[in-house]
C-alpha cells in the first residue's frame, strides 16, 4: 500500500482556538512492541488546529516587503535579436528586452501596489546598488567583490528604498540609463541582493542573467567542456541558498533563452528558497517577472512533519520509519508538497504487522512556520482513514492530481541527486498506477487532465530514458576496455 498526500498553504494565516488535551499514550509514538489500546487507537484532538508558539513575543511592525531586481549588464547583454515592430523588423539587445520588462513591471506595481518597495542592483565587473531620491548609488568593485562579509555590510548599510509611490520616476530613470559592458560578477551581486532583502522576511530577489558568473566569488566559468565548477563555488551557492532561506528571502532566476548560465548551481539556490528557475525568451520576460511578483510569500521558515502509526512507514525520504520532517522554507498560497508512505514490511520493526483490513489508521501533519509579523505558529492536521485490501476501491477513489504532482516532484528530486535510473523507474511506476486508475469509472475531466500531464511529462521521461541508456552504453564500453 503506497499513498500520496498533498498540502496546500492557502490558509496558513488563519488562527483557530486551541484545545488543551491530555493523553497517556501517543498514538504515533507508542512502543512498537505494544499493541494499540482502545484509548490510543484513535487520534485525539481537533482535525485542524493552529497554535501560537510564541504568545509572549511582541509582533513585528509590518512593513511592505522588498522586491529587488538583480540584473546582468555585462558585455554579452548587448547581443541582439530580431523582432517585428508592426511589419518592420528591428533589432533589440538582451538588455533592452530586460529594461522594457522591468519598466512594465514598475508601471503596473505603481498602480496596483504603490506601497511596495522596489530596488535595483546591477552587475558586470562591478556591483551597483542604485540610489533613489537623496541617496546616491554605491559601487562595489575590485578586491571588495571577494570579501563576503564586506559585501554583506555594504548591503546592510545601504538604505532600503521608500515605497514605489515615491521612487517610481527615479527608478525608471535608473533602468533607462543602463548600458552593457564588462564581466559577470553574479556571485557578489547575488550575495548583496539577498543580504539587502533579508531586512524584511518575505522579500523577493529576481536575478536575470545571460551568462555564467566569471569573477572570483562564485565563479562558474571553468575550462573544458566537461569540467565542473570548482568546489568552492558549489559551496558558495549552497551556503547562499541556506542563508537566503534562513532569512525568509525567496530567490528566482531568469536565464535568457539560448545562453549557458550553469542553472544546476543557480537552480539549487532558487529551489532552496522556493523560488522559480525559468529559461525565457527575451519577449517573455515581462510575463515571467509578473508571475514571480504576484506569487506572494505568506509564511517563512516552514517545516512539515509527517507522523504515521508504527504499522506504516514513509517512502522516498532520507529518514526511515514512521516519522519524517521536511524543511520547506518560504511558502506561497499555491505551494504544494507531497509525501509517499505505505505499509511497513513484515519483520522490519519488531513484530509490528501491517494494518488490518476494516480497521482505521490516523495520519498527522505538523506545520511549523513564521508569520510576517514574526509570530511562530504550529498547525496540526489529522486525518483518520479506513484500511481496505480491495484494490478496486482504492483505484476508483485515487485523486489523480495528487498522484501526478507526487510523480513529478519525486522524479525531479531523484534526478537532481543524479539518480536518473531511479527517477525513470519512479515515473514509470506512477504512470502505470494512474493508467490502472483510469480503467475505472472516471470523469472526462480526469482523462483530459491525465492526457495533458502525459504530454508535458513525456519529453522529460524520454530524456531520462535516453540519458540512462547512454550511461549503460558507456558502462558496457568501459567493461569491454
Language-model features: locations:
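Cys/His-coordinated zinc-binding microdomains
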Residues: 3-5, 10-11, 27-30
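Short, non-ligating residues that shape and space the ligands of small metal-coordination modules
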Residues: 9, 15-18, 35-36, 214
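Von Willebrand factor
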Residues: 30, 61-160, 186-192, 199-209, ...
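Long, acidic serine/threonine- and proline-rich intrinsically disordered regions
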Residues: 1, 345-481
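Short, charged loop segments at secondary-structure junctions
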Residues: 124-187, 212-230, 239-240, 247-249, ...
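Acidic, polar loop-rich interaction surfaces within structured domains
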Residues: 1, 216-219, 226, 230-376
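Intrinsically disordered, low-complexity regions enriched in proline, serine, glycine
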Residues: 35-39, 77-82, 86, 110-121, ...
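Acidic, polar low-complexity linker/tail segments
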Residues: 19-23, 30-69, 73-85
Amino acid at each position: 500500500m503506497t499513498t500520496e498526500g498533498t498540502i496546500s498553504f492557502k490558509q496558513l494565516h488563519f488562527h483557530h482556538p486551541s484545545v488543551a488535551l491530555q493523553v497517556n499514550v501517543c498514538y504515533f509514538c507508542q512502543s512498537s512492541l505494544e499493541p494499540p489500546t482502545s484509548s490510543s487507537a484513535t487520534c485525539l484532538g481537533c482535525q485542524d488546529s493552529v497554535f501560537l508558539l510564541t504568545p509572549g513575543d511582541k509582533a513585528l511592525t509590518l512593513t511592505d516587503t522588498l522586491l529587488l531586481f538583480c540584473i546582468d549588464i555585462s558585455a554579452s547583454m548587448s547581443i541582439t535579436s530580431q523582432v517585428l515592430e508592426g511589419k518592420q523588423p528591428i533589432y533589440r539587445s538582451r538588455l533592452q528586452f530586460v529594461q522594457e520588462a522591468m519598466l512594465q513591471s514598475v508601471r503596473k506595481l505603481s498602480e496596483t501596489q504603490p506601497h511596495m518597495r522596489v530596488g535595483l542592483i546591477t552587475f558586470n565587473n562591478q556591483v551597483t546598488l542604485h540610489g533613489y531620491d537623496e541617496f546616491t548609488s554605491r559601487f562595489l568593485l575590485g578586491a571588495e567583490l571577494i570579501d563576503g562579509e564586506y559585501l554583506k555590510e555594504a548591503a546592510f548599510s545601504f538604505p532600503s528604498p521608500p515605497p514605489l509611490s515615491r521612487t517610481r520616476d527615479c527608478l525608471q530613470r535608473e533602468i533607462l540609463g543602463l548600458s552593457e559592458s564588462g564581466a559577470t560578477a553574479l556571485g557578489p551581486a547575488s550575495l548583496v541582493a539577498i543580504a539587502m532583502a533579508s531586512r524584511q522576511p518575505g522579500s523577493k530577489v529576481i536575478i536575470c542573467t545571460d551568462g555564467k558568473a566569471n569573477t572570483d566569488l562564485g565563479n562558474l566559468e571553468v575550462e573544458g567542456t566537461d569540467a565542473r565548477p570548482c568546489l568552492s563555488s558549489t559551496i558558495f551557492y549552497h551556503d547562499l541558498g541556506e542563508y537566503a532561506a534562513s532569512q525568509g528571502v525567496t530567490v528566482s532566476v531568469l536565464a535568457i533563452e539560448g545562453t549557458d548560465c550553469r542553472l544546476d548551481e543557480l537552480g539549487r539556490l532558487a529551489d532552496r528558497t522556493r523560488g522559480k528557475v525559468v529559461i525565457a525568451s527575451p519577449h517573455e520576460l515581462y510575463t515571467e517577472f509578473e508571475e514571480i511578483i504576484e506569487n506572494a510569500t505568506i509564511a517563512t521558515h516552514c517545516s512539515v512533519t509527517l507522523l504515521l502509526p508504527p504499522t506504516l512507514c514513509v517512502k522516498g525520504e532520507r529518514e526511515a520509519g514512521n516519522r519524517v520532517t521536511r524543511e520547506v522554507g518560504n511558502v506561497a498560497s499555491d505551494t504544494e508538497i507531497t509525501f509517499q508512505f505505505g505499509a511497513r514490511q513484515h519483520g522490519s520493526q519488531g513484530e509490528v504487522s501491517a494494518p488490518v483490513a476494516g480497521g482505521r489508521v490516523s495520519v498527522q501533519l505538523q506545520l511549523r512556520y513564521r508569520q510576517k509579523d514574526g509570530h511562530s505558529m504550529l498547525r496540526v492536521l489529522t486525518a483518520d482513514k479506513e484500511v481496505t485490501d480491495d484494490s478496486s476501491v482504492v483505484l476508483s477513489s485515487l485523486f489523480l492530481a495528487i498522484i501526478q504532482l507526487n510523480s513529478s516532484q519525486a522524479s525531479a528530486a531523484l534526478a537532481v541527486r543524479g539518480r536518473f535510473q531511479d527517477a525513470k523507474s519512479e515515473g514509470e511506476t506512477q504512470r502505470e498506477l494512474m493508467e490502472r486508475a483510469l480503467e475505472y469509472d472516471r470523469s472526462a475531466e480526469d482523462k483530459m487532465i491525465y492526457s495533458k500531464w502525459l504530454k508535458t511529462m513525456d519529453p522529460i521521461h524520454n530524456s531520462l530514458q535516453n540519458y540512462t541508456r547512454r550511461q549503460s552504453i558507456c558502462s558496457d564500453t568501459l567493461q569491454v576496455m
